[in-house]
Amino acid sequence: MQVLTKRYPKNCLLKVMDRYSAVVRNMEQVVMIPSLLRDVELSGSGGSVQDGAPDLYTYFTMLKSICVEVDHGLLPREEWQAKVAGNEGSEAENEAAETEEAEEDRLSEELDLEAQFHLHFSSLHHILTHLTQKAQEVTQKYQEMTGQVL
């Protein structure tokens, strides 16, 4: 596993982001054959995935995708929306979404910006910590599957 070289305070978001990136890079180095992760559940006895539950491969690709954005910044809004929507959706849906977003923007300006910042900051910290744990679990599960457990 890669060692963090920068020193940040314990609960600093930059430290959480660096740790997440390091754990995902380690996961990418350990998982040599990602296709082995298909149809394997994250928790449990290593059985096949139940209906609707994400498999290890889904986690693997999601964690890598998020890491790219953490390391290199956000995609432009249009690209992100196209990626999420899978390039499917009508113009009417897009216009409705833009109208709803404009209303949300107006309301958000009226709210306390410091409170919004704190909410989003703490949520991001929590989510990145959770994703880091998931990346460690995917790595550990892959090592168990391939007999690489140290």
From Swiss-Prot:
Region (Disordered): 83-105
Compositionally biased tracts (Acidic residues): 90-105
A single Gene Ontology CC term: nucleus
Tissues in which the protein is found: Highly expressed in liver, lactating mammary gland, epididymal, retroperitoneal and brown fat. Mainly expressed in tissues that synthesize triglycerides.
Sorted UniProt keywords: Cytoplasm, Lipid biosynthesis, Lipid metabolism, Nucleus, Phosphoprotein, Transcription, Transcription regulation
Modified residues (Phosphoserine): S90
Reported function: Plays a role in the regulation of lipogenesis, especially in lactating mammary gland. Important for the biosynthesis of triglycerides with medium-length fatty acid chains. May modulate lipogenesis by interacting with MID1IP1 and preventing its interaction with ACACA. May function as transcriptional coactivator. May modulate the transcription factor activity of THRB.
Annotated family: Belongs to the SPOT14 family.
Protein's name according to its UniProt entry: Thyroid hormone-inducible hepatic protein
Organism: Rattus norvegicus
Gene that encodes it: Thrsp
